Each structure stands twice: as C-alpha cells, then as structure tokens.
Amino acid sequence: KQRLANLEEANAVLEARAQERYEAEKAAYEAKQREREEKTRKPRGRKPKPPEAGPRDKDQYNFTDPDSRIMKNSNNSGFDQHYNVQVAVDQESLLIVAPSLSNHPNDKKEAEPTLDALSPKVGKPKAAALDNGYFSEANIAALEKRCIDPYIATGREPHHKIWRTYFKQLPDQPPEEASPKVKMAYKLQTEIGKAIYRLRKCTVEPVIGIIKEVLGFRQFSLRSLLAASGEWCLVCLAFNLKRMHTLYQAKGLL
C-alpha cells in the first residue's frame, strides 16, 4: 500500500511540475512571438513551436529527495540531481549580501527571490549586473521597481572577441517603442554599461570559485528544499567569515 501511495504522490507531483513548465514555456513562446512581430525585417529561421501541456516521457521523480530536480551539471557533461543556488555579492567588499536556493533549473526565476533575500540592513544597491541566463522583461521590471539599475546580458558573449569589436562605434539610441531586449543590448554597449557589467566577472564568479575550491563545498549533505536552504546559508556564512577576516587583516585590525 505504501508503495502504491508513493507512486500516486509521484504522479501528482509530475503532473503539477508539467503544468508549471507549460505555463513558463507558454510565456516564453509568447515573448518570442512578440519579438518577431516587432521586427521591421522578416524574421529569420523557423517560427517557434507552441509548447505542449502534460508530463513528458523523460520526466523523472526522485524518491530519495523529491524536492531536488534534474539539472545540467557544472561542466555540462551530463545531468544530475541538483538544487539551484544563488548569491548576490557586494562589488566593493566581495561579501555575500543575499543567498538563495531553489529547485528551478532555469535562472530566469531566481533574480526576484535573491532580491527579496536582501536585508534592508545591508543597504540598497544602485545597480545590478546579471548574466544572460537571467534576462527577461519580468526581471528588468523587478529591478526597476526596487529602484535598482539593471544591466543584464541579452546573449552569450564570445570568449575570444575579434579586434574589430573593440573599435565598434556605439549605435544610435533605440526608439522609445523598442523592445526591452533591444534597449538593454544598447545599454550594455555604453561606456557605463560595459564598465558595470565587466565588474560582474570579478565579483560573483570568484566567490563561487572560492566556495567550491577553497571551502570545498560541491554537494549538499542534507535533503529537502528547507534543509538544503539552511545548509547553503551556513556555507555563505562561512565564506563571509573568511572574507571578513581577510578584510580586517588588510586594514591591520588583526
């Protein structure tokens, strides 16, 4: 009976996840359609296919830790059972000011929860730089609503730029009716946009690297979303204590 009850629970969870995925894919599909319609030239490539509702053959349920999800591993060599961790990092001190954790594979949903995790005691950031995995109109609106100037990449940057890109002139400012994606792409090409976004690479990425390589944290010991969230907060606290020791030492206070 218990096995049957577990299977029924798993089926209900898969149905709920499928509906959540369908709604997210539908919103993304509608956004792509709007973007195609806004273009003055005839769009290239095939029209995006509308999403299909319901569970898929490859959908899985983990009985050991039902809260975790199948996600791409860090080196993109396959898929594992994971949680999605996030940190907001202060650019000047390199201290973690907001940790968050979820079971959403897509980072687009993670900007707002991380912003919500920011305590008023640490102050309000003037600007925020995020990579292209976070780009969405909703995230731009969420940052602007909090009076935070957003700088979100609209696409992947090539690792090795050709020399012509360094001498490329700034294009004309897009019209007011241009899409948020076009406006953001222009914003990131301005001098201030390039300067702020450049700082992201030496702010968040070193923190994640230190957590993995120096603190040695690469997997969770606890199960469930709540327990894993607590464990992630402890890891971020450990990083901050280590970082504060370095900062105090540099000022001759230790």
Predicted segments with their positions:
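Anion-binding and metal-coordination hotspots
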Residues: 1-254
